[in-house]
A protein has these predicted regions:
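STAS-like cytosolic regulatory interaction modules
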Residues: 1-51, 60-102
Length: 102
């Protein structure tokens, strides 16, 4: 899993797998990045290739961390596998790319 950080603009881009098999690795990197940024976060998951409920839990935990500081985390440009899990679990954490950029 790679995490491209553009924290000056509040954008984090994750690629690769976000599954139970990589949950610890993803969590450490993602949460450290979220803690380092004191503002709204756009989490770009367009290059995520596998996503399961462990990945969903990581996204929800990251969102809770950001919201506890009075800010917002949005998933932008979810890949197909991410969108499928979000829809299946009836979870709304996405924002249209045009809304996220505004």
């Amino acid at each position: 899993m790679d995490l491209d950080q553009k924290l000056s603009t509040g954008e984090l881009r994750v690629d690769g797998d976000m599954t139970i098999y990589r949950a610890n690795e993803v969590a450490q990197t993602l949460f450290a990045s979220v803690r380092a940024h004191a503002g709204d976060v756009n989490l770009d998951l367009s290059d995520v290739t596998e996503f399961d409920t462990a990945g969903l839990q990581l996204v929800l935990m990251a969102r809770r961390m950001v919201e506890s500081n009075g800010h917002r985390l949005d998933v932008v440009r979810p890949s197909e596998c991410v969108a499928e899990v979000l829809e299946l679990c009836n979870v709304a954490v996405t924002t249209e790319p045009t809304q996220a950029a505004a």
